[in-house]
Amino acid sequence: MLIIQDHGFVVNPSAWTDEFLEYDYIGAPWAWSENAYIDPFGNHQRVGNGGVSLRSKKLMDVPNKVVIPWDVNQGDFYKHMNAGLFNEDGNICVHNKHLYEEQGCKYAPVEVAAKFSYERDLPENKGLTPFVFHYSLPPSLR
């Protein structure tokens, strides 16, 4: 399922590759931050922006198979999500990522995610014009 919020667009259809379909979740990479996108085990997560993301049926079915916590009072939820908002991408890709992985879900590595979607300038997407963008255009299209 291709999720596209109202501030995201397909900008480079020729950048599509079936490699994207090898993963159950792929979205624009997040910038590395010392104090953000940290899963409950202390690992920094870099892939997960949901504004424009590709999600498999397997991933979407996980909440039908296991209980996925959705509780802001559990641990330091906001630190894990880097936001005071209740965003599903932080839940799926940071806070509860391990539960999805236990069900066999695969997340794209940063290098593949950078070819899929752009949200902000990062070393991994320098010089790339990805398939889609979320929120701001890649430099090659400005």
Task: Map each language-model feature to its residues.
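Short aromatic/hydrophobic "clamp" motif used to bind/position activated sugar donors
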Residues: 1-2
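Conserved hydrolase catalytic core segment
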Residues: 5
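Conserved donor-nucleotide/metal-binding helix-loop-beta segment in metal-dependent transferases, i.e.
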Residues: 8-45
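Catalytic core and acceptor-binding pocket of nucleotide-sugar-dependent glycosyltransferases
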Residues: 45-142
